[in-house]
């Protein structure tokens, strides 16, 4: 039986170190062909996209023995080919495994966004798995229904941090159903 795992982590938090060590040991015990390290990283955007924080976080992971296989780069705009090559070069992650993690209206759009970038094929190839072409039409229809509802319902909730939308993101997502 093969075990497969993926991990994304904030390398700056000390409380995450035991988990990072656990995934490092998992890969050691089960091999590269049975594990996949996915690092979610923020591309800081000011007047231009900054890649230094991503390079730094990958460097910190490497210091503890973890080399990410895939980078999901959180950004509001797609990475240019030049930036993707630069990130690939300085993080030692294959260029096709440097993926945009763009802002989406609904979390349900994320799998479609990643599939459009070929992330499913990248994962399957890395793990040497055969997969058939995904049948995404039901998922696409679900996303379309969520984005274009036929009816509306007003729901109000009281909270301390209602001005900060992210504070209640999980509740907002749950209420969409």
Where are these regions (language model features)?
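Single conserved hydrophobic/aromatic residue that forms the stacking wall/gate
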Residues: 1-8, 12
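Structured alpha-helical segments in the cores of large, soluble enzyme domains
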Residues: 19-34, 53-60, 175
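Glycine-/acidic-rich phosphate or pyrophosphate-binding loops and their flanking alpha/beta elements
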Residues: 132-154
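Conserved alpha/beta core surface patches that mediate binding of polyanionic ligands
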Residues: 20-24, 50, 135-141
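Short histidine/acidic/glycine/proline-rich micro-motifs that form metal-
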Residues: 10, 44-45, 77, 161-163
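Phosphate-binding active sites in nucleotide-utilizing proteins
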Residues: 144, 153-177
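Glycine/threonine-rich flexible loop motifs
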Residues: 13-19, 166-169
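Internal gly/pro-rich beta-alpha loop/helix module
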Residues: 35-130, 143-146
């Amino acid at each position: 039986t093969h075990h497969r795992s993926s991990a994304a982590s904030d390398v700056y938090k000390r409380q995450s170190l035991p988990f990072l060590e656990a995934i490092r040991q998992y890969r050691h015990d089960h091999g590269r062909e049975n594990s996949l390290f996915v690092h979610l990283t923020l591309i800081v955007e000011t007047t231009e996209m900054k890649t230094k924080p991503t390079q730094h976080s990958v460097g910190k992971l490497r210091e503890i023995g973890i080399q990410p296989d895939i980078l999901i780069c959180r950004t509001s705009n797609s990475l240019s080919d030049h930036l993707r090559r630069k990130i690939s070069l300085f993080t030692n992650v294959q260029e096709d495994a440097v993926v945009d993690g763009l802002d989406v209206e609904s979390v349900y759009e994320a799998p479609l966004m990643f599939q459009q970038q070929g992330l499913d094929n990248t994962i399957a190839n890395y793990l040497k798995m055969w997969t058939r072409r995904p049948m995404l039409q039901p998922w696409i229809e679900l996303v379309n229904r969520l984005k274009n509802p036929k009816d509306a319902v007003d729901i109000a909730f009281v909270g301390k941090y209602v001005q900060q939308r992210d504070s209640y993101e999980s509740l907002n997502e749950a209420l969409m159903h």
